[in-house]
Design a protein with these regions (language model features):
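Divalent-metal coordination cores built from histidine and acidic residues
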Residues: 78-124
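A generic structural signal for short coil/turn motifs at secondary-structure boundaries
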Residues: 14, 65-67, 97-99
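N-terminal metal-binding scaffold of metallo-dependent hydrolase/deaminase domains
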Residues: 1-39
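Residues at the C-termini of beta-strands that transition into short coil/loop
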Residues: 35, 48, 123
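Short, low-complexity, polar/charged sequence segments that are solvent-exposed and flexible
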Residues: 24-29, 64, 75-78, 108-110
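Conserved active-site and cofactor/substrate-binding residues in soluble primary-metabolism enzymes
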Residues: 26, 69-72, 76, 99-103
Length: 124
């Protein structure tokens, strides 16, 4: 499936399109073309007035799991982070037990495999 993003203001210091307004064609999960693209026979989104950037990383996030899942789970925290533009979150457990051994680290990593972002365990 193709999707055309029109008028995307790019903020990415590593991109040759940094601080430029361009059109971006995505096919599947890959960016296939960037520039001043013609109208195409595919769905399009006009991003005029919006900014397109790389994903953000949160280095310290107190999630409830493990230990306080009634407050927040890794899945709900990851979903909230993804909706805010974050692609990686450093997970600090504010529950008991903390992340202080190999099993705790493996738990975070395995739960993270089913989320849309990278969950990175931060040990205590």
């Amino acid at each position: 499936m193709q999707l055309l993003f029109k008028n995307a203001y790019v903020v990415d210091v590593h991109s040759p399109y940094h601080l430029q307004t361009v059109d971006i064609l995505v096919e599947g999960s890959q960016i296939t073309s960037i520039g001043d693209l013609p109208e195409m026979d595919c769905p399009s989104v006009d991003l005029e007035g919006a900014t397109l950037t790389t994903g953000f990383a949160e280095l310290h996030s107190d999630l409830g799991e493990p230990g306080n899942e009634e407050c927040e789970t890794l899945e709900t925290g990851a979903a909230a982070a993804a909706s805010g533009g974050f692609t990686a979150v450093g997970v600090v457990s504010n529950g008991t037990p903390g992340i202080d051994n190999k099993t705790g680290i493996e738990f975070i990593l395995s739960k993270g495999e089913s989320t849309a972002i990278n969950l990175v365990p931060v040990g205590s």
